[in-house]
Amino acid sequence: MTPAEHRLWEAVRRSALGVRARPQHVIRGWIVDFYVPAKRLVIEVDGDVHDGQVDDDARRTEALHAEGLVVVRVRNDEVLGALAEVLERIRAVMASR
């Protein structure tokens, strides 16, 4: 896990979202950063490497959507600098499910 993934995982593990999540979960051959089964929600933490993978990320997100999953993407710097806001954004998505 990257430092940002670890920080988000620690918050999620301490029930910051009020649901159980699985880190590094395999879905259809892809390893997603976090999966929240109760909400069919995937959380991806994107670092600088993802800037060059926009097309790949879009295909992956589209395939996950086709499976009925919602994908929330957050950037490393958001998790490291504004964790409360990231968690609130994730909660808002979960509330709509």
Language-model segment annotations:
Residues 1-97:
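Nucleic-acid endo/exonuclease domains
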